[in-house]
Regions:
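A conserved beta-strand element that flanks and buttresses the S-adenosyl-L-methionine
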Residues: 91
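A short glycine-rich, Lys/Arg-flanked "PGG" loop and its adjoining helix->strand segment in the class I
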Residues: 103-117
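Class I SAM-dependent methyltransferase SAM/SAH-binding core
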Residues: 40-79
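Conserved class I S-adenosyl-L-methionine
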Residues: 1-34, 48-52, 116-141, 173-177
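Short alpha-helix
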Residues: 142-157
């Protein structure tokens, strides 16, 4: 699985939906970056959250399970190699749907955070969408509904203080290209997503949620 992500590192770095967006702006804002603030960016991918936080004055450490992503630390979200309360804030954007054990990952993020955890991920949950996601990218585990995110954060000992739901515009062809989806599967993915796709685009339901200790 990590080999697959490593091979896509450049695609994640240049991806329009990863490198910009209201969700990225909000994750950065809710981390409250500034001089003296330390942040761990979990599953950093193309490093977009880390870059924005550093530009805002925060000290950022990046972690990712895929060596090819070039993170400061190669580690899965479920096993973060840091002491308790090592960072003011822990951020994780557009990655949790890949985690083998999302509950363990959120618990680990809460453990190494002093103040808060900020998570952003897709909430497109249906049988058809899950089949489409796995067909497009076998590293996809599953998306989680808003109520599930509430439970995950609360079980990790976090108090939910902010949340915002939004829809992000997703261009289908680059999305399929980024995962190197085989030609035989692309048509089926489009079929499964059905009339959600309009003129080659679809709106992707997304949640940004913040939990404090």
């Amino acid at each position: 699985m990590t080999d697959a992500w490593s091979s896509r590192a450049d695609a994640y770095r240049t991806s329009a939906i990863h490198s910009a967006g209201d969700d990225l702006d909000l994750v950065v804002e809710w981390c409250e970056p500034g001089e003296g603030v330390t942040v761990l960016d979990v599953a950093t991918g193309g490093g977009h959250v880390a870059r924005r936080l550093r530009d805002a004055g925060a000290t950022v450490v990046t972690a990712d399970p895929a060596p090819g992503m070039g993170a400061d630390t190669t580690a899965p979200a479920e096993h973060l190699p840091f002491a308790n309360s090592s960072f003011d804030v822990v951020a994780c954007r557009l990655a949790a749907h890949h985690f083998a054990d999302v509950s363990a990952a959120v618990t680990e993020m809460a453990r190494v955070a002093r103040r808060a955890v900020v998570i952003c991920d897709n909430t497109f949950v249906s049988a058809a969408s899950e089949e489409a996601d796995r067909l497009r990218d076998p590293t996809h585990v599953r998306n989680y509904a808003v109520a599930e995110w509430h439970s995950l954060l609360e079980q990790a000992g976090l108090e939910i203080t902010d949340e915002r739901f939004m829809e992000r515009p997703l261009e289908i062809e680059p999305w399929l290209d980024r995962a190197a989806t085989p030609a035989r599967d692309r048509a089926r993915v489009v079929e499964l997503l059905g009339d959600r796709i309009v003129d080659g685009w679809m709106d992707l339901p997304t949640l940004v949620i913040k939990g404090q200790k």
